[in-house]
């Protein structure tokens, strides 16, 4: 049994939008996601745009065209909604590439009905990962022309209804897909959520470390600017130094003729001031040559690119961790169903065996077989409790008295 899967999330900044753009359009040089098969990337396609887009520019264009609200849009307003539509591998394994494209065309049709065709930014299908899926983006503009991600996305109840409508939409197109159950209904294991949170926390810490490096560079730059300004102030200080011409006697030991020696005599204090201004001039001259040559701009540009790459990789790791967790969660649903079927069959077999052997013989035999395996003994007891609840309700008080005893942890005779 396969499921229809649709998820949606708010994108809170232009930087995050750029990270999504690079992931969706495969613009990065390297990817942390090992599921990407680069030899198949050419099979990816977008059902909205013929060419690659700058998502932030496209969002601004959509808002300019479709926003009719009277209020000025806040700088921290959410302008981008990102989502994903897919199913499981069992579904796509039975689809040709043309069938798969038709499925996503129907999915795009649903998005246009929900959000409005003019508000759809992209609908990009990735065929180069383990499971085909479609990333979609929307500008959250309401029917009356306001920008409101809160109203367009809604709360958990609204999201549940959104998922219901999508499942009904694909069913009407002939796909026998069940609705993907929410985590609250399926009671996903706490361990899985903890692992996901650990991965997310790791990338968050990595991003914070890179931010600290950036702050350190900024502090260093501020310090250099202060030193530069100090040198500039020294250089601008007017020079007004009293001085004397050095003289010497000429014409022999007893001669009175005096002439200038060609040197100027100044005080030690004034000499030190000269030295400061000379050093300031040298420092500024070196900085000027560094800037004039273009090396300063090149170095700063390189530094910004490196930091931008690190930030994009951190964003991509978080997105991939989120995608991998959701895919793992959805793939586990069929396994859960199979386990439930197996348990149901086991109950039927045990009930029949109990009928053939009789209650006492059956219970003694099971307890004997599992007495050295506490977990198996406990499992057998739980199954028997579900099969014969009336026996346990009658002996509830007795169970409470014996619950800490080592023996009699299995079935009741």
Curated annotation (Swiss-Prot):
The keyword Ribosomal protein does not apply. Residues 188-198, 403-413 have a biased composition (Basic and acidic residues). InterPro entries: Mob_Pre. Signal peptide: none annotated. DNA binds at residues 45, 115. Keywords: DNA-binding, Plasmid. Pfam families: Mob_Pre. GO terms for biological process: DNA recombination. Contains conserved positively charged amino acids probably involved in the binding of the pre protein to the RSA site. The interaction of the RSA site and the PRE protein may not only serves a function in plasmid maintenance, but may also contributes to the distribution of small antibiotic resistance plasmids among Gram-positive bacteria. Belongs to the plasmid mobilization pre family. This is Plasmid recombination enzyme type 3. It comes from Staphylococcus aureus.
């Amino acid at each position: 049994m396969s499921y229809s899967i649709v998820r949606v999330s708010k994108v809170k900044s232009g930087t995050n939008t750029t990270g999504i753009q690079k992931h969706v359009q495969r613009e990065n040089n390297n990817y942390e996601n090992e599921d990407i098969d680069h030899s198949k990337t050419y099979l990816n396609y977008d059902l909205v745009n013929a060419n690659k887009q700058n998502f932030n520019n496209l969002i601004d264009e959509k808002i300019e065209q479709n926003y009719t609200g009277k209020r000025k849009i806040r700088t921290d307003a959410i302008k981008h909604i990102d989502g994903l539509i897919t199913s499981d591998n069992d579904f796509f394994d039975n689809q040709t590439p043309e069938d798969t494209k038709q499925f996503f065309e129907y999915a795009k049709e649903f998005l246009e009905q929900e959000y409005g065709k003019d508000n759809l930014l992209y609908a990009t299908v990735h065929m180069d990962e383990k499971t085909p899926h479609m990333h979609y983006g929307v500008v959250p503009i309401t029917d009356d022309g306001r920008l409101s991600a809160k109203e367009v996305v809604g709360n958990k109840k609204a999201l549940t209804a959104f998922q219901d409508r999508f499942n009904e939409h694909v069913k009407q197109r002939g796909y026998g897909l069940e609705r993907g159950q929410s985590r609250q209904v399926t009671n996903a294991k706490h361990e899985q959520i903890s692992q996901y949170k650990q991965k997310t926390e790791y990338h968050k810490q990595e991003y914070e470390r890179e931010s600290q490096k950036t702050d350190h560079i900024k502090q260093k730059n501020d310090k250099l600017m202060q030193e530069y300004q100090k040198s500039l102030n020294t250089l601008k200080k007017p020079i007004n130094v009293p001085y004397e011409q050095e003289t010497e006697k000429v014409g022999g030991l007893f001669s009175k003729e005096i002439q200038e020696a060609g040197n100027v005599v100044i005080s030690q204090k004034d000499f030190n001031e000269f030295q400061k201004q000379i050093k300031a001039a040298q420092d500024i001259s070196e900085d000027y040559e560094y800037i004039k040559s273009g090396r300063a701009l090149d170095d700063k540009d390189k530094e910004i690119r490196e930091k931008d790459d690190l930030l994009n990789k951190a964003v991509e790791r978080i997105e991939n961790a989120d995608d991998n967790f959701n895919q793992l969660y959805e793939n586990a649903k069929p396994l859960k169903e199979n386990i439930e079927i197996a348990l149901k069959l086991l109950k039927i077999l045990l009930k029949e065996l109990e009928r053939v052997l009789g209650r006492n013989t059956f219970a003694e035999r099971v307890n004997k077989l599992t007495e050295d395996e506490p977990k198996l003994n406990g499992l057998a007891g739980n199954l028997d409790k579900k099969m014969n609840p009336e026996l346990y309700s009658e002996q509830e008080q007795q169970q409470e008295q014996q619950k800490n005893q080592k023996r009699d942890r299995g079935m009741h005779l």
